[in-house]
């Protein structure tokens, strides 16, 4: 933080916790998401703020043809990849839960939300992005803050304002197959107020019988996405969009993902299993490759 005032980290941390409690928690029965899921099959009134988030989220789901889908929470919990019992589910279990997956199973009418019976919402994939957007709103009310870089868990980054020396904010991108945490694929330059999100199969996964099962699910199959991509980094104007787009692009793969990014005016970087890096036109101006084992290739249109 570049500020002339008191330390704002405490206030910012509280805002993030409030978002987790209010919008993201499945376990807190007082959270709006928990109440929505408990009322599956009925219509529930939500806050204007949550209604605004949901409108954007479901537009992203539609624009990505369901590659990003906020109704996939049951599938994620069945695999339990980030829990104590990660495992490959039986196909019969997946088939049963897939009946309740599909963004079309949720209807929005202003601040009224209706979930078809059995459908549930999980905003975890956009949680950090929503947090970044909320932090930006807060920083814009603080006249003594001129610039800031916020890193929420490594995968979501927000820059605010310009550094005093006028230089770009440089954000390192992880090499998806790095042996050490300090081995980076390259650096992305951010300028002014921008949002960056990364999705990769190296973040959360388990290996069974030599197969890597990661946490980014394909809503159409109920299995970890197989698009040939190992990592995607997106830069755009809001944190929510950056998070959702990086997830969708990971599921879609390079060509379809790049087309989606065009509709949002976002920049993207795709890494594939053969150590190729694909950059959209805007990302070519931002990205500097550091890893010698990778090569930059053109995206085929």
Regions found by a protein language model. Name each.
Residues 1-301:
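Mature catalytic core of soluble alpha/beta enzymes
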């Amino acid at each position: 933080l570049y500020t002339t005032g008191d330390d704002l980290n405490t206030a910012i941390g509280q805002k993030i916790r409030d978002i987790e409690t209010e919008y993201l928690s499945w376990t807190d029965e007082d959270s709006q998401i928990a109440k929505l899921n408990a009322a599956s099959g009925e219509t529930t009134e939500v806050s204007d703020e949550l209604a605004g988030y949901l409108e954007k989220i479901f537009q992203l789901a539609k624009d990505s043809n369901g590659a990003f889908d906020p109704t996939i929470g049951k599938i994620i919990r069945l695999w339990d990849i980030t829990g104590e019992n990660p495992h490959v589910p039986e196909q019969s279990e997946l088939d049963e839960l897939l009946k309740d997956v599909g963004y079309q199973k949720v209807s929005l009418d202003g601040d009224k939300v209706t979930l078809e019976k059995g459908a549930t919402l999980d905003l975890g994939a956009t949680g950090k992005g929503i947090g970044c957007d909320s932090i930006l709103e807060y920083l814009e009310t603080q006249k003594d803050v001129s610039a800031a870089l916020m890193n929420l868990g490594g995968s979501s980054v927000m820059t605010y304002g310009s550094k005093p020396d006028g230089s770009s904010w440089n954000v390192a991108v992880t090499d998806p197959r790095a042996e050490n945490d300090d081995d980076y694929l390259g650096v992305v330059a951010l300028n002014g107020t921008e949002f960056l999100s990364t999705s990769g199969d190296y973040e959360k996964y388990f290996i069974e019988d030599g197969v890597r099962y990661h946490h980014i699910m394909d809503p159409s199959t109920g299995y970890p996405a197989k698009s040939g991509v190992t990592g995607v980094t997106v830069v755009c104007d809001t944190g929510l969009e950056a998070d959702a787009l990086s997830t969708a692009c990971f599921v879609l793969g390079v060509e379809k993902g790049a087309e989606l990014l065009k509709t949002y005016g976002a920049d993207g970087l795709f890494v594939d299993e053969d150590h190729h890096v694909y950059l959209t036109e805007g990302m070519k101006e931002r990205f500097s490759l550091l890893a010698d084992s990778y090569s930059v290739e053109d995206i085929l249109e």
